[in-house]
Amino acid sequence: MTCCNQQSSQPKTTTNCAESSCYKKTWSDHRGTRIERGCGCPQVKSGIKLECCHTNECNN
């Protein structure tokens, strides 16, 4: 499966993943809204929005 793995508003990059899902985490800090993308569907702390999906590049 192919997932996006760029940070925040960086140009789109992708990676091939062994997992069958991709994730997109969104949170805010002193720098503003932060976004992290990658493979799998990790556990997150409260206050972090997590979206997981199951198709190629679905986490852009």
UniProtKB/Swiss-Prot annotation:
Subcellular location: Secreted
Disulfide bonds: C3-C22, C17-C39, C41-C52, C53-C58
GO cellular component, one term: extracellular region
Residues forming coiled coils: none
GO molecular function: acetylcholine receptor inhibitor activity; ion channel regulator activity; toxin activity
Pfam family, one: Toxin_cobra-type
Keywords: Acetylcholine receptor inhibiting toxin, Disulfide bond, Ion channel impairing toxin, Neurotoxin, Postsynaptic neurotoxin, Secreted, Toxin
InterPro entries named among the record's database cross-references: Snake_3FTx (IPR003571), Snake_toxin-like_sf (IPR045860), Snake_toxin_con_site (IPR018354), Toxin_cobra-type (IPR054131)
Tissues of expression: Expressed by the venom gland.
Chief site of localization: secreted
Family: Belongs to the three-finger toxin family. Short-chain subfamily. Type I alpha-neurotoxin sub-subfamily.
Known role: Binds to muscle nicotinic acetylcholine receptor (nAChR) and inhibit acetylcholine from binding to the receptor, thereby impairing neuromuscular transmission.
UniProt protein name: Pelamitoxin a
